[in-house]
Protein backbone atom coordinates (compact mmCIF):
# COMPACT_ATOMS: atom_id res chain seq x y z
CA UNK A 1 0.00 0.00 0.00
CA UNK A 2 1.30 3.50 -0.83
CA UNK A 3 2.43 5.81 1.96
CA UNK A 4 -0.05 8.27 3.46
CA UNK A 5 1.84 11.15 1.85
CA UNK A 6 1.54 9.81 -1.70
CA UNK A 7 -2.02 8.70 -1.08
CA UNK A 8 -2.92 12.13 0.24
CA UNK A 9 -1.40 13.84 -2.77
CA UNK A 10 -3.26 11.49 -5.09
CA UNK A 11 -6.56 12.20 -3.37
CA UNK A 12 -5.94 15.94 -3.54
CA UNK A 13 -5.34 15.63 -7.27
CA UNK A 14 -8.59 13.69 -7.71
CA UNK A 15 -10.46 16.42 -5.86
CA UNK A 16 -8.87 19.23 -7.88
CA UNK A 17 -9.37 17.66 -11.30
CA UNK A 18 -12.91 16.46 -10.76
CA UNK A 19 -14.07 19.64 -9.05
CA UNK A 20 -12.81 21.57 -12.07
CA UNK A 21 -14.89 19.32 -14.34
CA UNK A 22 -18.00 19.90 -12.22
CA UNK A 23 -17.53 23.67 -12.17
CA UNK A 24 -16.95 23.73 -15.93
CA UNK A 25 -20.23 21.90 -16.48
CA UNK A 26 -22.07 24.27 -14.14
CA UNK A 27 -20.73 27.33 -15.94
CA UNK A 28 -21.74 25.88 -19.30
CA UNK A 29 -25.25 25.24 -17.98
CA UNK A 30 -25.59 28.69 -16.43
CA UNK A 31 -25.52 27.28 -12.91
CA UNK A 32 -23.82 29.06 -10.00
CA UNK A 33 -20.66 27.62 -8.40
CA UNK A 34 -21.08 24.89 -5.81
CA UNK A 35 -22.56 26.38 -2.65
CA UNK A 36 -24.83 25.67 0.32
CA UNK A 37 -25.86 29.31 0.53
CA UNK A 38 -29.52 30.35 0.71
CA UNK A 39 -29.80 30.94 -3.05
CA UNK A 40 -28.09 27.72 -4.15
CA UNK A 41 -30.12 25.31 -6.32
CA UNK A 42 -31.54 22.61 -4.08
CA UNK A 43 -31.13 19.54 -6.28
CA UNK A 44 -29.01 19.59 -9.43
CA UNK A 45 -29.13 16.44 -11.58
CA UNK A 46 -25.89 15.79 -13.47
CA UNK A 47 -25.36 13.70 -16.63
CA UNK A 48 -23.54 10.39 -16.02
CA UNK A 49 -20.04 11.70 -16.87
CA UNK A 50 -20.37 14.65 -14.47
CA UNK A 51 -22.06 12.53 -11.80
CA UNK A 52 -18.99 10.27 -11.93
CA UNK A 53 -16.83 13.33 -11.19
CA UNK A 54 -19.11 14.34 -8.31
CA UNK A 55 -18.88 10.88 -6.79
CA UNK A 56 -15.08 10.92 -7.14
CA UNK A 57 -14.90 14.24 -5.27
CA UNK A 58 -17.14 12.94 -2.48
CA UNK A 59 -15.14 9.73 -2.02
CA UNK A 60 -11.72 11.41 -2.18
CA UNK A 61 -12.82 14.17 0.20
CA UNK A 62 -14.09 11.66 2.74
CA UNK A 63 -10.86 9.67 2.68
CA UNK A 64 -8.52 12.67 2.64
CA UNK A 65 -10.35 14.34 5.51
CA UNK A 66 -10.08 11.20 7.60
CA UNK A 67 -6.40 10.72 6.78
CA UNK A 68 -5.73 14.28 7.90
CA UNK A 69 -7.85 13.83 11.03
CA UNK A 70 -5.91 10.79 12.23
CA UNK A 71 -6.98 7.73 14.23
CA UNK A 72 -7.39 9.35 17.65
CA UNK A 73 -9.51 12.29 16.53
CA UNK A 74 -11.54 9.98 14.30
CA UNK A 75 -12.72 8.22 17.44
CA UNK A 76 -13.16 11.34 19.59
CA UNK A 77 -14.58 14.03 17.31
CA UNK A 78 -17.37 12.25 15.36
CA UNK A 79 -19.19 11.32 18.57
CA UNK A 80 -19.53 14.98 19.49
CA UNK A 81 -20.59 15.86 15.96
CA UNK A 82 -23.23 13.11 15.80
CA UNK A 83 -24.62 14.13 19.20
CA UNK A 84 -24.83 17.77 18.15
CA UNK A 85 -26.33 17.16 14.72
CA UNK A 86 -28.90 14.76 16.13
CA UNK A 87 -29.91 17.07 18.97
CA UNK A 88 -30.13 20.18 16.80
CA UNK A 89 -31.98 18.35 14.02
CA UNK A 90 -34.50 16.92 16.47
CA UNK A 91 -35.03 20.42 17.90
CA UNK A 92 -35.58 21.82 14.39
CA UNK A 93 -38.14 19.10 13.66
CA UNK A 94 -39.97 19.17 16.99
CA UNK A 95 -40.41 22.96 16.94
CA UNK A 96 -40.90 23.17 13.15
CA UNK A 97 -38.10 25.75 12.99
CA UNK A 98 -37.54 25.43 9.25
CA UNK A 99 -41.08 26.61 8.50
CA UNK A 100 -40.93 29.40 11.08
CA UNK A 101 -38.10 31.10 9.19
CA UNK A 102 -39.03 32.84 5.91
CA UNK A 103 -37.67 31.22 2.76
CA UNK A 104 -36.49 34.66 1.64
CA UNK A 105 -35.11 37.03 4.25
CA UNK A 106 -34.60 36.33 7.94
CA UNK A 107 -36.19 36.46 11.37
CA UNK A 108 -34.92 37.86 14.65
CA UNK A 109 -34.16 35.54 17.52
CA UNK A 110 -36.70 37.49 19.56
CA UNK A 111 -39.54 36.90 17.09
CA UNK A 112 -38.61 33.25 16.64
CA UNK A 113 -38.48 32.85 20.41
CA UNK A 114 -42.04 34.15 20.73
CA UNK A 115 -43.25 31.85 17.95
CA UNK A 116 -41.94 28.65 19.54
CA UNK A 117 -41.89 29.63 23.24
CA UNK A 118 -38.21 28.93 23.85
CA UNK A 119 -36.06 31.53 25.60
CA UNK A 120 -33.78 33.57 23.33
CA UNK A 121 -30.45 32.55 24.96
CA UNK A 122 -31.26 28.84 24.67
CA UNK A 123 -32.67 29.20 21.16
CA UNK A 124 -29.54 31.03 20.03
CA UNK A 125 -27.28 28.44 21.67
CA UNK A 126 -29.00 25.50 19.96
CA UNK A 127 -29.17 27.07 16.50
CA UNK A 128 -25.56 28.26 16.65
CA UNK A 129 -24.52 24.69 17.49
CA UNK A 130 -25.98 23.61 14.15
CA UNK A 131 -24.54 26.42 12.05
CA UNK A 132 -21.09 24.80 11.55
CA UNK A 133 -23.04 21.90 10.00
CA UNK A 134 -24.81 24.19 7.48
CA UNK A 135 -28.05 24.38 9.48
CA UNK A 136 -29.11 28.05 9.21
CA UNK A 137 -26.80 31.05 9.48
CA UNK A 138 -26.85 34.51 11.03
CA UNK A 139 -27.63 36.86 8.16
CA UNK A 140 -27.03 39.91 10.39
CA UNK A 141 -26.60 40.45 14.13
CA UNK A 142 -29.51 38.98 16.07
CA UNK A 143 -31.15 37.39 13.02
CA UNK A 144 -31.21 33.88 11.54
CA UNK A 145 -31.86 32.76 7.95
CA UNK A 146 -31.94 29.61 5.87
CA UNK A 147 -29.06 27.84 4.20
CA UNK A 148 -29.86 25.59 1.26
CA UNK A 149 -29.86 22.53 3.54
CA UNK A 150 -32.53 23.96 5.86
CA UNK A 151 -34.53 25.62 3.10
CA UNK A 152 -35.16 22.21 1.56
CA UNK A 153 -36.65 21.05 4.89
CA UNK A 154 -39.17 23.89 4.70
CA UNK A 155 -40.04 23.56 1.03
CA UNK A 156 -39.95 19.78 0.43
CA UNK A 157 -42.34 17.71 2.54
CA UNK A 158 -40.57 14.44 1.73
CA UNK A 159 -37.26 15.83 3.02
CA UNK A 160 -39.04 17.03 6.15
CA UNK A 161 -40.59 13.59 6.63
CA UNK A 162 -37.21 11.90 6.17
CA UNK A 163 -35.53 14.21 8.67
CA UNK A 164 -38.24 13.59 11.26
CA UNK A 165 -38.06 9.86 10.60
CA UNK A 166 -34.38 9.60 11.42
CA UNK A 167 -34.70 11.68 14.60
CA UNK A 168 -37.83 9.89 15.83
CA UNK A 169 -37.29 6.37 14.46
CA UNK A 170 -33.79 5.60 13.17
CA UNK A 171 -31.72 7.14 15.96
CA UNK A 172 -33.82 5.61 18.78
CA UNK A 173 -33.66 2.26 16.98
CA UNK A 174 -29.86 2.47 16.78
CA UNK A 175 -29.63 3.42 20.45
CA UNK A 176 -31.73 0.38 21.38
CA UNK A 177 -29.74 -2.18 19.39
CA UNK A 178 -27.46 -3.36 22.21
CA UNK A 179 -30.40 -3.84 24.57
CA UNK A 180 -32.29 -5.74 21.88
CA UNK A 181 -29.35 -8.06 21.20
CA UNK A 182 -29.04 -8.86 24.90
CA UNK A 183 -32.67 -9.98 24.83
CA UNK A 184 -32.49 -11.68 21.41
CA UNK A 185 -28.84 -12.49 20.50
CA UNK A 186 -29.78 -14.09 17.18
CA UNK A 187 -31.70 -11.00 15.97
CA UNK A 188 -34.42 -13.28 14.61
CA UNK A 189 -37.56 -11.81 16.21
CA UNK A 190 -39.11 -8.65 14.65
CA UNK A 191 -40.72 -7.82 18.00
CA UNK A 192 -37.29 -7.50 19.64
CA UNK A 193 -35.46 -5.02 17.44
CA UNK A 194 -33.63 -1.90 18.51
CA UNK A 195 -36.70 0.06 17.50
CA UNK A 196 -39.20 -2.14 19.31
CA UNK A 197 -37.33 -2.30 22.63
CA UNK A 198 -37.03 1.50 22.54
CA UNK A 199 -40.49 2.53 21.34
CA UNK A 200 -42.67 -0.55 21.14
CA UNK A 201 -45.48 -1.53 23.51
CA UNK A 202 -45.87 -5.25 22.97
CA UNK A 203 -46.50 -5.13 19.22
CA UNK A 204 -45.18 -7.97 17.05
CA UNK A 205 -43.12 -5.64 14.87
CA UNK A 206 -42.64 -2.13 13.54
CA UNK A 207 -45.54 -2.22 11.07
CA UNK A 208 -47.93 -3.21 13.85
CA UNK A 209 -46.52 -0.35 15.93
CA UNK A 210 -47.29 2.02 13.04
CA UNK A 211 -50.93 0.88 13.06
CA UNK A 212 -51.20 2.51 16.51
CA UNK A 213 -49.21 5.62 15.52
CA UNK A 214 -50.63 6.96 12.25
CA UNK A 215 -48.48 10.11 12.09
CA UNK A 216 -45.27 8.11 12.27
CA UNK A 217 -46.75 5.69 9.73
CA UNK A 218 -47.52 8.62 7.41
CA UNK A 219 -43.95 9.89 7.61
CA UNK A 220 -42.55 6.42 6.99
CA UNK A 221 -44.81 6.01 3.94
CA UNK A 222 -43.64 9.41 2.70
CA UNK A 223 -40.02 8.37 2.94
CA UNK A 224 -40.72 5.13 1.09
CA UNK A 225 -42.44 7.19 -1.60
CA UNK A 226 -39.30 9.31 -1.89
CA UNK A 227 -37.17 6.18 -2.30
CA UNK A 228 -39.49 4.93 -5.04
CA UNK A 229 -38.97 8.20 -6.95
CA UNK A 230 -35.20 7.72 -6.90
CA UNK A 231 -34.01 6.63 -10.35
CA UNK A 232 -32.04 3.81 -8.72
CA UNK A 233 -35.36 2.26 -7.61
CA UNK A 234 -37.31 3.03 -10.80
CA UNK A 235 -39.82 0.37 -11.86
CA UNK A 236 -38.34 0.35 -15.37
CA UNK A 237 -35.32 -1.56 -14.03
CA UNK A 238 -37.68 -4.46 -13.31
CA UNK A 239 -39.63 -4.28 -16.56
CA UNK A 240 -36.42 -3.94 -18.61
CA UNK A 241 -34.85 -7.01 -16.98
CA UNK A 242 -37.99 -9.15 -16.92
CA UNK A 243 -37.32 -12.71 -18.19
CA UNK A 244 -38.29 -13.16 -21.83
CA UNK A 245 -39.96 -16.51 -21.14
CA UNK A 246 -42.27 -15.03 -18.46
CA UNK A 247 -44.00 -12.31 -20.47
CA UNK A 248 -47.31 -14.18 -20.70
CA UNK A 249 -49.35 -16.19 -18.21
CA UNK A 250 -50.50 -15.55 -14.65
CA UNK A 251 -48.35 -13.45 -12.30
CA UNK A 252 -48.97 -12.94 -8.58
CA UNK A 253 -47.44 -9.75 -7.15
CA UNK A 254 -47.12 -10.35 -3.40
CA UNK A 255 -46.99 -7.22 -1.25
CA UNK A 256 -47.85 -5.21 -4.36
CA UNK A 257 -49.73 -2.41 -2.56
CA UNK A 258 -51.78 -0.27 -4.96
CA UNK A 259 -50.33 -1.96 -8.04
CA UNK A 260 -47.84 0.57 -9.41
CA UNK A 261 -45.41 -2.20 -10.38
CA UNK A 262 -48.18 -4.47 -11.67
CA UNK A 263 -49.57 -1.78 -13.96
CA UNK A 264 -46.09 -1.06 -15.33
CA UNK A 265 -45.64 -4.76 -16.13
CA UNK A 266 -49.12 -4.97 -17.65
CA UNK A 267 -48.35 -1.97 -19.84
CA UNK A 268 -45.19 -3.55 -21.22
CA UNK A 269 -46.42 -7.16 -21.29
CA UNK A 270 -50.16 -7.21 -22.09
CA UNK A 271 -50.07 -11.01 -22.17
CA UNK A 272 -49.70 -11.12 -18.39
CA UNK A 273 -52.68 -11.69 -16.12
CA UNK A 274 -51.62 -10.09 -12.82
CA UNK A 275 -53.06 -10.56 -9.34
CA UNK A 276 -51.84 -8.03 -6.77
CA UNK A 277 -51.93 -9.25 -3.18
CA UNK A 278 -51.50 -7.26 0.02
CA UNK A 279 -53.12 -6.74 3.40
CA UNK A 280 -56.59 -5.14 3.28
CA UNK A 281 -55.39 -1.79 4.59
CA UNK A 282 -52.73 -1.55 1.90
CA UNK A 283 -55.32 -2.23 -0.81
CA UNK A 284 -57.77 0.47 0.30
CA UNK A 285 -56.40 2.98 -2.24
CA UNK A 286 -56.07 0.43 -5.06
CA UNK A 287 -58.20 0.83 -8.19
CA UNK A 288 -58.64 -1.41 -11.20
CA UNK A 289 -57.72 0.32 -14.45
CA UNK A 290 -59.81 -0.26 -17.53
CA UNK A 291 -57.98 -2.19 -20.21
CA UNK A 292 -55.33 -3.49 -17.81
CA UNK A 293 -55.40 -7.15 -16.82
CA UNK A 294 -54.68 -6.41 -13.15
CA UNK A 295 -56.86 -7.47 -10.21
CA UNK A 296 -56.49 -7.16 -6.44
CA UNK A 297 -56.81 -9.75 -3.68
CA UNK A 298 -56.41 -9.37 0.10
CA UNK A 299 -53.80 -11.83 1.34
CA UNK A 300 -51.22 -12.19 4.10
CA UNK A 301 -48.14 -13.74 2.47
CA UNK A 302 -47.35 -15.71 5.63
CA UNK A 303 -50.48 -17.77 4.93
CA UNK A 304 -50.86 -20.44 2.26
CA UNK A 305 -51.00 -18.94 -1.23
CA UNK A 306 -54.60 -19.05 -2.52
CA UNK A 307 -53.75 -18.57 -6.22
CA UNK A 308 -52.92 -22.03 -7.51
CA UNK A 309 -50.77 -22.87 -10.52
CA UNK A 310 -49.67 -19.33 -11.43
CA UNK A 311 -46.69 -19.07 -13.74
CA UNK A 312 -44.78 -16.49 -11.67
CA UNK A 313 -44.90 -15.32 -8.05
CA UNK A 314 -43.06 -12.04 -7.49
CA UNK A 315 -41.65 -10.19 -4.47
CA UNK A 316 -40.38 -6.72 -5.35
CA UNK A 317 -38.49 -4.98 -2.54
CA UNK A 318 -40.29 -7.03 0.11
CA UNK A 319 -38.11 -9.76 1.57
CA UNK A 320 -35.28 -7.50 2.79
CA UNK A 321 -37.68 -6.29 5.51
CA UNK A 322 -37.86 -9.71 7.17
CA UNK A 323 -35.47 -11.89 9.21
CA UNK A 324 -34.25 -15.11 7.63
CA UNK A 325 -36.77 -17.34 9.39
CA UNK A 326 -39.66 -15.16 8.26
CA UNK A 327 -38.42 -15.12 4.65
CA UNK A 328 -38.39 -18.91 4.75
CA UNK A 329 -41.97 -18.92 6.06
CA UNK A 330 -43.03 -16.59 3.23
CA UNK A 331 -41.44 -18.79 0.57
CA UNK A 332 -42.79 -22.02 2.08
CA UNK A 333 -46.31 -20.56 2.03
CA UNK A 334 -46.06 -20.71 -1.78
CA UNK A 335 -45.16 -24.38 -1.96
CA UNK A 336 -48.67 -25.96 -1.90
CA UNK A 337 -49.67 -23.79 -4.87
CA UNK A 338 -46.61 -24.23 -7.08
CA UNK A 339 -46.73 -26.24 -10.28
CA UNK A 340 -43.56 -27.77 -11.77
CA UNK A 341 -41.55 -25.09 -13.55
CA UNK A 342 -43.30 -22.19 -11.81
CA UNK A 343 -41.04 -19.23 -11.13
CA UNK A 344 -40.49 -17.07 -8.09
CA UNK A 345 -38.92 -13.73 -8.92
CA UNK A 346 -37.27 -11.72 -6.16
CA UNK A 347 -36.40 -8.15 -7.13
CA UNK A 348 -34.49 -6.78 -4.18
CA UNK A 349 -31.19 -5.39 -2.97
CA UNK A 350 -28.08 -7.57 -3.14
CA UNK A 351 -25.14 -6.48 -1.01
CA UNK A 352 -21.85 -6.47 -2.96
CA UNK A 353 -18.77 -8.02 -1.30
CA UNK A 354 -17.26 -5.82 1.43
CA UNK A 355 -14.71 -3.28 0.24
CA UNK A 356 -15.60 -3.45 -3.45
CA UNK A 357 -17.63 -0.22 -3.70
CA UNK A 358 -16.52 3.44 -3.65
CA UNK A 359 -16.33 4.68 -0.07
CA UNK A 360 -19.46 6.84 -0.09
CA UNK A 361 -21.59 4.12 -1.72
CA UNK A 362 -20.23 1.45 0.63
CA UNK A 363 -21.22 3.62 3.59
CA UNK A 364 -24.66 4.21 2.10
CA UNK A 365 -25.23 0.48 1.61
CA UNK A 366 -23.97 -0.35 5.10
CA UNK A 367 -26.17 2.40 6.56
CA UNK A 368 -29.22 0.78 4.98
CA UNK A 369 -28.09 -2.66 6.13
CA UNK A 370 -27.64 -1.40 9.69
CA UNK A 371 -31.05 0.25 9.53
CA UNK A 372 -32.62 -3.06 8.49
CA UNK A 373 -31.11 -4.65 11.59
CA UNK A 374 -32.25 -1.96 14.02
CA UNK A 375 -35.77 -1.70 12.57
CA UNK A 376 -36.63 -5.24 11.46
CA UNK A 377 -33.83 -7.61 12.57
CA UNK A 378 -33.28 -8.08 8.86
CA UNK A 379 -30.41 -7.32 6.49
CA UNK A 380 -29.33 -6.50 2.95
CA UNK A 381 -28.24 -9.98 1.90
CA UNK A 382 -25.33 -10.76 -0.39
CA UNK A 383 -25.94 -13.24 -3.17
CA UNK A 384 -24.56 -16.17 -1.16
CA UNK A 385 -26.98 -15.37 1.68
CA UNK A 386 -29.87 -15.04 -0.76
CA UNK A 387 -29.15 -18.44 -2.30
CA UNK A 388 -28.79 -20.05 1.12
CA UNK A 389 -32.06 -18.70 2.45
CA UNK A 390 -33.92 -19.71 -0.73
CA UNK A 391 -32.63 -23.29 -0.85
CA UNK A 392 -32.99 -23.72 2.92
CA UNK A 393 -36.66 -22.80 2.56
CA UNK A 394 -37.10 -25.82 0.31
CA UNK A 395 -34.50 -27.78 -1.65
CA UNK A 396 -36.88 -27.80 -4.62
CA UNK A 397 -36.32 -24.07 -5.12
CA UNK A 398 -33.56 -23.71 -7.71
CA UNK A 399 -31.88 -20.33 -8.31
CA UNK A 400 -31.42 -20.25 -12.09
CA UNK A 401 -30.21 -16.71 -12.67
CA UNK A 402 -29.28 -13.35 -11.17
CA UNK A 403 -29.46 -10.07 -13.09
CA UNK A 404 -27.95 -6.75 -12.05
CA UNK A 405 -29.67 -3.96 -14.03
CA UNK A 406 -27.38 -1.00 -14.72
CA UNK A 407 -27.86 1.97 -12.36
CA UNK A 408 -30.38 0.02 -10.27
CA UNK A 409 -30.08 -0.65 -6.54
CA UNK A 410 -32.34 -3.67 -6.96
CA UNK A 411 -31.39 -6.91 -8.69
CA UNK A 412 -33.44 -9.78 -10.07
CA UNK A 413 -33.14 -13.30 -8.66
CA UNK A 414 -34.90 -15.94 -10.76
CA UNK A 415 -36.03 -19.11 -8.97
CA UNK A 416 -37.63 -22.16 -10.57
CA UNK A 417 -39.72 -24.74 -8.68
CA UNK A 418 -38.35 -28.17 -9.55
CA UNK A 419 -40.13 -30.89 -7.52
From Swiss-Prot:
Record note on disruption phenotype: Impairs the production of griseofulvin, but accumulates the intermediates norlichexanthone, griseophenone E, griseophenone F and desmethyl-dehydrogriseofulvin B.
Pathway annotation: Secondary metabolite biosynthesis; terpenoid biosynthesis
Keywords associated with the record: Methyltransferase, S-adenosyl-L-methionine, Transferase
One GO MF term: O-methyltransferase activity
GO BP terms in the entry: griseofulvin biosynthetic process; methylation; terpenoid biosynthetic process
Catalysed transformations (reactions): 2-(2,4-dihydroxy-6-oxidobenzoyl)-5-hydroxy-3-methylbenzenolate + S-adenosyl-L-methionine = griseophenone D + S-adenosyl-L-homocysteine + H(+)
Ligand binding (S-adenosyl-L-methionine): 255-256, 278, 300-301, 316
Database matches in Gene3D superfamilies: Vaccinia Virus protein VP39 (3.40.50.150), Winged helix-like DNA-binding domain superfamily/Winged helix DNA-binding domain (1.10.10.10)
Catalytic site positions: 320 (proton acceptor)
Biotechnology: Griseofulvin is a spirocyclic fungal natural product used in treatment of fungal dermatophytes.
Disulfide bond in keyword set: no
InterPro entries: COMT-like (IPR016461), O_MeTrfase_dom (IPR001077), SAM-dependent_MTases_sf (IPR029063), WH-like_DNA-bd_sf (IPR036388), WH_DNA-bd_sf (IPR036390)
EC number: 2.1.1.-
Role, per record: O-methyltransferase; part of the gene cluster that mediates the biosynthesis of griseofulvin, an important antifungal drug that has been in use for a long time for treating dermatophyte infections. The first step of the pathway is the formation of the heptaketide backbone by gsfA which is initiated by priming with acetyl-CoA, followed by sequential condensations of 6 malonyl-CoA units. The resulting benzophenone can undergo a spontaneous dehydration to form norlichexanthone.
Similarity remark: Belongs to the class I-like SAM-binding methyltransferase superfamily. Cation-independent O-methyltransferase family.
Protein name per the record: O-methyltransferase gsfB
Organism, as annotated: Penicillium aethiopicum
Lineage, uppermost ranks: Eukaryota, Fungi, Dikarya, Ascomycota, Pezizomycotina
Amino acid sequence: MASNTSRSAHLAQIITENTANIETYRREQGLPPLSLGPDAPLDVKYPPNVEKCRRAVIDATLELGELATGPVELRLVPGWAIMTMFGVTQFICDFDIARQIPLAGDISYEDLSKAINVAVPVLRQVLRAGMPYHMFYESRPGHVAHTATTKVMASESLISDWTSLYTDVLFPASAGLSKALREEPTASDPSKTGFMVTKGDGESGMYMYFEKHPEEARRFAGVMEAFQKDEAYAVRHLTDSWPSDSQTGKLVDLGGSTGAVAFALAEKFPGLEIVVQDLPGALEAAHVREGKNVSFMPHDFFNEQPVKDADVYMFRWILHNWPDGHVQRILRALVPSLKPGAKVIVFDEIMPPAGTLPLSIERYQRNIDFGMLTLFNSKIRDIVEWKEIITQSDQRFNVTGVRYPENSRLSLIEIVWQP
